[in-house]
């Protein structure tokens, strides 16, 4: 991390999540750039999941609209977030993937929300069909 970036979240406090028996860790990656209008709804949809063994990683492309303030406000609810200039959405997604620790990786756009059963359903299929790539 350089002087032109900010970061935070539970990992900064050395709180790491991992797979549990029959409960794979799901890494949820959200990429955002100047979308403070919807970001908090997206964060809350992750927090409201029935399936709790997940981590939320948010990669911000150095927003200027107040997005970082939303991230700071939710610092204790997000596993890891960083705000730094990137080379576009795919660069940001790749950063998120490199930071992920889960057996499953899910992309959640910053203006989207999860239905509360989404991760529970996805992980049940993941556990049931071991030979299928999702």
Mark where each language-model region is.
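Nucleotide-sugar donor-binding/catalytic module of glycosyltransferases
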Residues: 1-134
């Amino acid at each position: 991390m350089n002087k032109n970036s900010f970061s935070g979240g539970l990992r900064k406090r050395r709180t790491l999540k991992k797979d549990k028996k029959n409960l794979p860790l799901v890494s949820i990656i959200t990429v955002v750039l100047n979308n403070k209008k919807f970001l908090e709804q997206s964060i809350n949809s992750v927090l409201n999941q029935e399936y709790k063994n997940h981590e939320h990683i948010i990669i911000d492309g150095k927003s200027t609209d107040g997005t970082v303030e939303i991230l700071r406000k939710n610092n204790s609810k997000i596993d890891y977030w960083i705000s730094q200039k990137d080379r576009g959405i795919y660069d940001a997604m790749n950063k998120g993937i490199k930071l992920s620790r889960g057996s499953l990786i899910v992309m959640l756009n910053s203006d989207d929300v999860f239905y509360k059963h989404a991760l529970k359903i996805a992980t049940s299929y993941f556990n049931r069909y071991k030979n299928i790539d999702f």
